[in-house]
Amino acid sequence: MKETFDHAYLEEHMRLNHFRNHYELTRKNLMVKNLKRLRRQLEKESGKLEAQKCDFFPSTYELPSEYHIFVDEYRRNPGSIWIMKPIAKSQGKGIFLFKRLKDITDWKKGTEYQPASDPSKEAPETYVVSRYIENPYLIGGRKFDIRIYCLITSYSPLKVWIYRNGFARFSNTRFSLESIDDNYVHLTNVAIQKTAPDYDPERGCKWSTQQLRKYLTARHGQEKTDQLFNKMNEVFILCIS
């Protein structure tokens, strides 16, 4: 324990629940940076086919530092939809979708982007911008994401435990690209969905992992459902390796 972790500020009764540099996983921009680095490493050492294992997330850039790189990619895909997220916020705060570069120009004029002329002032808030998935898999016509918890007990050797009781979070409103500014359609954060005018607190907007697997098995069969969850486990390993 003492050889592996920083312990200068730990008292006798304290226990650790974070590894050193855990933010390399929990900060959105650092996670993307590390996955891009892993992809380059795999391509160099094992070839393009092996590197394709990292192609599970859409094109993503850090703003403002990669703004000009993003603009080049945006112009290569006219009419596409993108999603902006602050790197260190939760509950859907600060997230928005856009289709026109002008919307980013307006954002740049906001206080979040303004560079600090005074070194004593805080630096502009960092965002990630990702290509929005315009044809997501829907259940009941609604978007959802899956929240799975992993307990990492060791990195050398790597030991990871997957918590079985994860859950899927659903949007409250049926999916449509007609109104990309409607967070009740496009975001699955419970903090946002529970404020929807027609939100039903008894029904909620969550399924357990077991409910999700049962639905997918009934819809697509046991083999394909098992393949999906095995692929998810592979993604977990890539993210933490």
Protein language model features and the residues they cover:
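Conserved N-proximal alpha/beta basic substrate-recognition cap immediately N-terminal to
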Residues: M1-I83, I87-S90, L97-G110
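Catalytic core of tubulin tyrosine ligase-like
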Residues: I69, N77-S241
